[in-house]
Amino acid sequence: MKSILVGAAVALVVSILFTPYLIRVFSRQGFGQEIREEVQQSHAAKRGTPTMGGVAILVAMWAGYLVAHLTVTDEPPTASGLLVLGLTTALGIVGFLDDFIKIRKQRNLGLNKTAKLVGQLVASVLFAVLAMQFANQNGITPASEHLSFIRDITVISFGSVGFVIFAYIAISGWSNAVNFTDGMDGLAGGTAAMVLAIYVVISFWQFRNNCSAPNGPALACYTVRDPLDIALVAGAAMAACVGFLWWNAAPAKIFMGDTGSLALGGLLAGLSMVTRTELLMIIIGGLFVVEALSVVMQIVVFRSTRRRLFRMAPFHHHFELAGWAETTVIIRFWVLAAISAMFGLGLFYADWLSLAREFF
């Protein structure tokens, strides 16, 4: 537990202190955000606000993780922790390239769809292949070929190739979902912090009730490799998001950009796979799912009927164009995100209770 607290504290401090440094550097370099034409009127004042703030989140997350390992725990970094951090960083690099092209070309279009998908594909395949390696002494690998809800669903197995395909779909889906949500000051960062806080609790609970515990399996135990290190990653990332939110809250002094949104989406996907909660993540990160679905529904309905289902997609812009103040949309969406996240945590705990009762 001490390692989680130290990692989170370091990440929080680094994020709060490093972000204003990036604001000054990016402002001098002219690394300002371009605004979508559809929202130019309401977001015109945001044009030129420094972007690529996701760099601060990544640096803070890594700093928290490494300092905790160097100062608190005698254990080296684990395969699960490094794989999730590596996936997060790889997608952050894809997002950084996307942001950089937008800035250089002075438009709101960066990498083309093919280049972005290829970047996500490479990161996803590397993660999926490596996550099926590095079995511990009990034969448990960071990820599993089985689909999972709160635990592996043993009757549903993807196989090696199928898991790689599934991982790509999950990682690209979550990274794009967070990217869609990042359209208002602090919306994606605040929501991600809530989801990550839930994953600190989940992974620490899995550590306390692990099937590979030195003193023998706990009641209703979890077959997860490196749960304590996963909790450290989630805690450092959560604190990094909170520190960044200090500067990203409305009115934002900096945006996370695709650097941050793609990285955080990859982080959520990676956490869901290494904790065996892939389907539960859909509930915990429900706001991200709704935002992504609103884009899909808008496209499908428009192509079918030539009419728009929403005033504008993603969903948060629909309410903004309906006359809601931006801060009102953000706070109400945060409330919905918190409800969804807590409901997911409740399902996780209810599953443990139902299985634990069988032993009494």
Curated annotation (Swiss-Prot):
BP GO terms, sorted: cell division; cell wall organization; peptidoglycan biosynthetic process; regulation of cell shape
Any one of the GO CC terms: plasma membrane
Primary subcellular site in the record, as a coarse category: membrane
Spans through the membrane: 3-23, 52-72, 81-101, 115-135, 153-173, 187-207, 230-250, 254-274, 282-302, 333-353
Enzyme class: transferase
Topological category with respect to the lipid bilayer: Multi-pass membrane protein
One annotated GO molecular function: UDP-N-acetylmuramoyl-L-alanyl-D-glutamyl-meso-2,6-diaminopimelyl-D-alanyl-D-alanine:undecaprenyl-phosphate transferase activity
Subcellular location: Cell membrane
InterPro entries xrefs: Glycosyl_transferase_4, PNAcMuramoyl-5peptid_Trfase, PNAcMuramoyl-5peptid_Trfase_CS
Record keywords, A-Z: Cell cycle, Cell division, Cell membrane, Cell shape, Cell wall biogenesis/degradation, Magnesium, Membrane, Metal-binding, Peptidoglycan synthesis, Transferase, Transmembrane, Transmembrane helix
Domain of life (superkingdom): Bacteria
Enzymatic reactions: UDP-N-acetyl-alpha-D-muramoyl-L-alanyl-gamma-D-glutamyl-meso-2,6-diaminopimeloyl-D-alanyl-D-alanine + di-trans,octa-cis-undecaprenyl phosphate = di-trans,octa-cis-undecaprenyl diphospho-N-acetyl-alpha-D-muramoyl-L-alanyl-D-glutamyl-meso-2,6-diaminopimeloyl-D-alanyl-D-alanine + UMP
EC number(s) per entry: 2.7.8.13
Cofactor: Mg(2+)
Pathway per the UniProt entry: Cell wall biogenesis; peptidoglycan biosynthesis
Pfam families according to UniProt: Glycos_transf_4, MraY_sig1
Family named by the database record: Belongs to the glycosyltransferase 4 family. MraY subfamily.
Function recorded in the entry: Catalyzes the initial step of the lipid cycle reactions in the biosynthesis of the cell wall peptidoglycan: transfers peptidoglycan precursor phospho-MurNAc-pentapeptide from UDP-MurNAc-pentapeptide onto the lipid carrier undecaprenyl phosphate, yielding undecaprenyl-pyrophosphoryl-MurNAc-pentapeptide, known as lipid I.
PANTHER family associated with the record: PHOSPHO-N-ACETYLMURAMOYL-PENTAPEPTIDE-TRANSFERASE, PHOSPHO-N-ACETYLMURAMOYL-PENTAPEPTIDE-TRANSFERASE HOMOLOG
Protein name listed in UniProt: Phospho-N-acetylmuramoyl-pentapeptide-transferase
Lineage: Bacteria, Bacillati, Actinomycetota, Actinomycetes, Pseudonocardiales
